[in-house]
C-alpha cells in the first residue's frame, strides 16, 4: 500500500489560537485515529510548511521524509492545505505523487468549483466523495507510481499529444477536417458564441503506439483549462482501460473482487464485519436502477421481456452484450456501434443527470461553469463545451444535427490521420513548458483489466450492487461496466463508416514490422525498471517549471543496461532522448570533432533533432 493518509484543512492567516478547520482526514491503512492524534499530525504538517517557507517564500509545496513515512503538502488555495502521506520505499517517486496530488485537486475544482466558495459542511462531504475513491483506487494497483512515465513527474499541467508527420516536415497548415469542424460547428450562425470550444482526442484501446495517443486539437487559444480537462480524460482511460459513459459520468470505480477481499481477510486473520449500510442502500436504491437490474435479469433468464415497451420509449442502449458472448464475429463492430453520444441529454432520463450533461468549472477569459457533452467515433473522443445559457443543446433535433457535423469532420480525419509513423532507432520525450504539451514515443502505462484478472474489477455505483442483491450472487464476476455502454443509437444510414488506415478489412489491427518504440516489447516489470532509471536521471536536475532567463543545459549519460540518455533543458522545453547503444545497428563512421553533444547519439538522432529543434509544439 503506497498512500497512507490524506488530509485537507483550512488555516486562516489571521488565526491567532493556532487551531484550524479540518475538512478531510482519511487514513487508507484503516487505522482508527483519535482526535488528538489527528491534531498532532496536522501540527506536524503546519510546522513543516512554516519551516520550509522560512527558506523560500515562492514554494507552493513542501516535501519531507520522516521516520515512518514521507509527506507532501500543497497550498491548493489561499489558506487551504492538502497533505499526502506515503511509504518511504517510494520516496524517490515523490515528484509523481506531487503532480498527481495537485491534479486530484484540479479535478475537484473543475467539477465542484473553488473550495473557498463552498460552505464548510457541504465542502466536507464533497471532499470525501472525490478524494477518498481517487486514492483508494490508486492504492489497489501495485507500483502505480513506479509505472507512471517520467512525464507525470515534471508538472501537473503536462498532457500527452498526438504526433503528426507534417509537423516533423515543417508543414503547419490547418487540415480539412479542422476547417470543417471550425466552420460548421463553432462558427455556424446557430452555434457561434454558444459552443465555446471543441476538444478532440485520439485514445486507442490497444495503447501500442504512444505517438498516436492523446490530445489532437482544440479551437480556442484562450481555453486555459485545457490541461486539466485533458489530464482528467486521459486519467479515466488509463485507470479503467477505456473511456465510457460510466467513466465520464463518474459512476465507475475500481474495486477488489470478492475473492481478493477474502484473501486479504485471511492474511489479516480476521473477518470484516458485515456492511449494514451497503445492505440498506441496496434495499433503498432508486427504482430506476432496479428497473435496469430487472432488465438485465430478463436478458439472463429469458423472462420479463415486457420491459421492452418501456425501454422503447427512450433512446436505445448498446445492449448488454460482451465480446465473449458474441464469439469471433464480434471483432468487427456494427456501424451504429462505431459512434455515439457518451454524455448527452439524449441518454435515458431515468439515469443520473451526470449522464445527460457534465457541468464543469473552466477558464476561458474568466472562471465560470460550462456544460460539457462527450461524443465518440472509433478511437476519437470529442468534448463539446457549451455556454450554460444555450438551451437548444437539450433538443434532440439539434443534437442529431450536431452529431452529423461531428461525424463529417472526424470522417475526414480518418481518411488520412497523418500520424507520424517513421521508424526510429531511439525514443524521446519533448515537453513544452508554457503550453503544457508533451510528445513522447516511450510506452505509457494503461490498466489492462480483463476477466482473467481475479484481483480487480470495474463496477458501476448503484447498479452492480443492485444486480448482486437481486440475483443473490455475491461472487458475480462480470460487471455492467465491462459489458455495457450508454449511448444514443443515432445511425447515419446514408453514410458509410470510413475505414481506419491502421486496420485491416476485418477491423483488426494491421501488423507493422517496424516497431514504434525501441521499448515496445517491454513487459510491465521492465517498464517499471525503465521508469526508475529515468527518474534517477531527472532527480539530478532542477525540476524547474518555467524561468525566462535560463541558459540551455544538456547532459549525456551511459547506463550499465545499455541505454544512452541525452537530456536538454532551456526556458522553452525539456528534451529526453534514449538510445540503446548495445544494439545500435547504424554503421559507426569517423567524423570531424563537433561541439554538439547530441551528435554522439548517431546521425539518425542528429538528423531528426535538426529537423524539429526549432519547432513550436508539434
From Swiss-Prot:
This is Vacuolar fusion protein CCZ1. It is found in: Endosome, Multivesicular body membrane; Prevacuolar compartment membrane; Vacuole membrane; Vesicle. Forms a complex with MON1. The keyword Cell division does not apply. PANTHER family: VACUOLAR FUSION PROTEIN CCZ1 HOMOLOG-RELATED. In complex with MON1, is required for multiple vacuole delivery pathways including the cytoplasm to vacuole transport (Cvt), autophagy, pexophagy and endocytosis. The MON1-CCZ1 complex acts at the fusion of vesicles with the vacuole, through its regulation of the SNARE complex during the coordinated priming and docking stages of fusion, and particularly at the stage of tethering/docking. It comes from the Eukaryota. Residues 490-517 are annotated as: Disordered. The keyword Transport applies. The gene is CCZ1. It is a peripheral membrane protein. Residues 502-515 have a biased composition (Basic and acidic residues). Pfam families: Intu_longin_1 (PF19031). Keywords: Autophagy, Endosome, Membrane, Protein transport, Transport, Vacuole. One of its GO terms (biological process) is autophagy. Belongs to the CCZ1 family.
Amino acid at each position: 500500500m503506497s498512500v497512507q493518509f490524506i488530509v485537507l484543512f483550512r488555516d486562516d492567516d489571521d488565526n491567532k489560537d493556532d487551531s484550524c478547520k479540518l475538512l478531510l482526514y482519511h487514513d487508507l491503512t484503516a487505522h482508527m485515529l483519535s482526535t488528538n492524534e489527528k491534531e498532532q499530525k496536522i501540527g506536524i504538517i503546519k510546522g513543516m510548511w512554516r519551516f520550509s517557507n522560512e527558506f523560500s517564500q515562492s514554494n507552493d509545496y513542501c516535501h519531507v521524509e520522516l521516520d515512518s513515512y514521507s509527506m507532501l503538502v500543497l497550498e491548493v488555495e489561499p489558506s487551504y492545505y492538502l497533505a499526502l502521506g506515503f511509504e518511504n520505499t517510494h520516496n524517490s517517486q515523490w515528484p509523481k505523487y506531487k503532480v498527481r496530488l495537485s491534479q486530484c485537486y484540479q479535478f475537484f475544482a473543475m467539477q465542484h468549483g473553488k473550495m473557498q466558495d463552498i460552505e464548510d459542511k457541504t465542502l466536507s462531504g464533497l471532499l470525501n466523495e472525490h478524494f477518498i475513491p481517487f486514492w483508494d483506487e490508486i492504492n489497489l494497483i501495485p507500483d502505480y507510481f513506479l509505472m507512471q512515465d517520467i512525464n507525470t513527474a515534471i508538472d501537473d499541467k503536462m498532457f500527452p499529444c498526438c504526433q503528426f508527420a507534417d509537423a516533423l516536415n515543417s508543414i503547419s497548415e490547418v487540415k480539412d477536417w479542422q476547417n470543417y469542424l471550425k466552420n460548421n460547428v463553432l462558427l455556424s450562425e446557430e452555434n457561434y458564441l454558444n459552443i465555446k470550444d471543441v476538444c478532440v482526442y485520439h485514445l486507442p484501446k490497444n495503447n501500442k503506439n504512444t505517438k498516436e495517443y492523446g490530445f489532437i486539437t482544440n479551437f480556442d487559444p484562450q481555453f486555459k483549462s485545457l490541461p486539466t480537462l485533458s489530464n482528467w480524460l486521459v486519467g479515466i482511460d488509463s485507470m479503467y482501460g477505456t473511456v465510457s459513459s460510466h467513466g465520464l459520468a463518474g459512476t465507475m470505480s475500481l474495486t477488489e473482487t470478492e475473492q481478493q477481499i477474502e484473501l486479504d481477510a485471511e492474511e489479516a486473520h480476521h473477518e470484516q464485519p458485515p456492511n449494514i449500510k451497503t445492505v440498506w442502500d441496496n434495499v433503498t436504491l432508486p427504482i430506476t436502477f432496479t428497473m435496469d437490474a430487472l432488465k438485465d435479469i430478463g436478458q439472463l433468464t429469458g423472462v420479463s421481456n415486457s420491459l421492452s415497451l418501456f425501454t422503447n420509449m427512450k433512446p436505445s442502449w448498446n445492449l448488454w452484450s460482451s465480446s465473449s458472448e458474441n464469439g469471433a464475429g464480434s471483432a468487427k463492430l456494427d456501424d451504429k456501434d462505431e459512434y455515439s453520444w457518451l454524455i448527452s441529454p439524449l441518454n435515458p432520463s431515468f439515469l443520473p443527470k451526470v449522464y445527460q450533461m457534465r457541468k464543469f468549472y473552466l477558464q476561458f477569459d474568466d472562471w465560470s461553469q460550462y456544460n460539457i457533452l462527450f461524443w465518440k467515433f472509433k478511437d476519437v473522443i470529442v468534448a463539446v463545451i457549451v455556454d450554460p445559457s444555450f438551451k437548444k443543446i437539450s433538443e434532440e433535433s439539434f443534437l442529431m444535427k450536431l452529431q452529423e457535423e461531428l461525424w463529417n469532420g472526424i470522417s475526414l480525419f480518418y481518411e488520412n490521420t497523418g500520424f507520424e509513423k517513421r521508424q526510429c532507432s531511439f525514443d524521446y520525450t519533448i515537453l513544452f513548458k508554457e503550453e503544457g504539451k508533451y510528445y513522447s514515443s516511450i510506452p505509457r502505462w494503461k490498466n489492462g483489466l480483463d476477466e482473467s484478472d481475479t484481483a480487480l474489477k470495474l463496477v458501476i455505483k448503484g447498479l452492480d450492487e443492485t444486480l448482486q442483491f437481486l440475483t443473490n450472487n455475491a461472487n458475480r464476476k462480470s460487471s455492467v461496466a465491462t459489458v455495457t455502454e450508454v449511448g444514443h443509437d443515432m445511425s447515419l444510414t446514408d453514410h458509410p463508416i470510413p475505414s481506419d488506415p491502421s486496420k485491416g478489412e476485418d477491423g483488426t489491427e494491421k501488423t507493422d514490422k517496424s516497431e514504434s518504440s525501441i521499448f515496445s516489447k517491454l513487459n510491465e516489470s521492465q517498464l517499471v525498471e525503465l521508469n526508475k532509471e529515468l527518474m534517477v536521471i531527472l532527480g539530478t536536475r532542477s525540476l524547474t517549471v518555467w524561468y525566462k532567463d535560463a541558459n540551455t543545459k544538456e547532459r549525456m549519460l551511459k547506463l550499465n543496461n545499455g541505454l544512452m540518455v541525452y537530456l536538454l533543458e532551456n526556458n522553452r522545453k525539456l528534451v529526453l532522448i534514449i538510445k540503446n547503444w548495445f544494439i545500435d545497428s547504424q554503421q559507426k563512421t569517423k567524423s570531424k570533432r563537433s561541439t554538439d553533444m547530441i551528435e554522439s547519439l548517431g546521425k539518425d538522432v542528429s538528423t531528426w533533432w535538426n529537423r524539429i529543434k526549432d519547432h513550436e509544439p508539434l
